[in-house]
């Protein structure tokens, strides 16, 4: 079976700076792949390439076997790829439920005229979106259920804002979730909960997931495979233990070779 997502020999540069170099990467159905690497490794650029924010100079990006290179971000989302961000992008003055409904509106058929006139079809779609939002929020249990539907997003804890960001991604009817540092800024208890949640997204909700994460405890706990980048190059791929102990990965994080040269 072909991978759900596949990058073939993808390269991206900004001026003279090569940010991604000849990258091959794939994510299979119902698989969690974590991407690690020091700052400047090219991780965020990778997400921007997959979601259509950037276009590669070379190579191809396939989703469900079809190229998505050149498609705008909204069409890539419609294809089934949704993304969360390291810096949360919620509508803080809207309620929890309204935030999720807003994410789902991209899949409605109603145009401006139908929306203004409040046609029967538009009202039916709103009921469907309302039910969809409640379904996605129910996945998070008491953290986002019940009375929290009517809470404004700014009143949520940081961890629950993270959950809401994921719920919004789920509401786009995605098959592939791109999670950008989902555990960033969380305490150990919250980090443990988000680790369990990511596994649940795969095991119970059936998502395939590509994750950028700096917390190695999270990476170890969720990953089917780990890919390490450094200056846009893939330097290791395999299980967590294989990648974490790979000499090039140790060097990228700790500068072992540089330290050894200084000691000579």
Predicted regions and their residues:
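Glycine-rich phosphate-binding loops of nucleotide-dependent enzymes
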Residues: 2-264
